[in-house]
Amino acid sequence: MLLPKRTKYRKMMKGRNRGYATRGVDLALGEFGLKAVEAGRVNSRQIESARQAYTRHVKRQAKTWIRVFPDKPITKKPLETRMGKGKGGVEEWVMNIKPGRIIFEMSGVSEELAREALTLAMHKLPFKTKFVTKESENEVY
């Protein structure tokens, strides 16, 4: 499970997830990747589930990179608790994803195998994504 070792503050404000990604939008490490088409947030369990799905399919032949890291704490108050008494405890760690962000990268396998593997990972994520290559990464999403 991905989570920060330590943080300056335990809890964070909710914020808004608007606009398009400006960083992490190009394939930097691999030949193929998975790019977000819509906004959302992804937690460490979803990242791990997607990673396992594509790793099993390529049978560890490919070199892969995870380009996102959940560094935002999400809090939740216990069930049947009255309002007030402060903010709840940290429930999970997430990362806000904006359209255009590269989630996973892969190299060392054929395009066909990479497409199949990353399609399995797409189904594990809570927002729409698309398969990109070095040639197709600059297309409008």
Curated annotation (Swiss-Prot):
GO terms for cellular component: cytosolic large ribosomal subunit. InterPro entries: Ribosomal_uL16, Ribosomal_uL16_bact-type, Ribosomal_uL16_CS, Ribosomal_uL16_dom, Ribosomal_uL16_sf. GO terms for biological process: translation. Gene3D superfamilies: Ribosomal protein L10e/L16 (3.90.1170.10). The keyword Thylakoid does not apply. It comes from the Bacteria. Pfam families: Ribosomal_L16. Keywords: Ribonucleoprotein, Ribosomal protein, RNA-binding, rRNA-binding, tRNA-binding. One of its GO terms (molecular function) is structural constituent of ribosome. Belongs to the universal ribosomal protein uL16 family. Part of the 50S ribosomal subunit. PANTHER family: 50S/60S RIBOSOMAL PROTEIN L16, LARGE RIBOSOMAL SUBUNIT PROTEIN UL16M. Binds 23S rRNA and is also seen to make contacts with the A and possibly P site tRNAs. This is Large ribosomal subunit protein uL16. It comes from Campylobacter fetus subsp. fetus (strain 82-40). The lineage of its organism: Bacteria, Pseudomonadati, Campylobacterota, Epsilonproteobacteria, Campylobacterales. The gene is rplP.
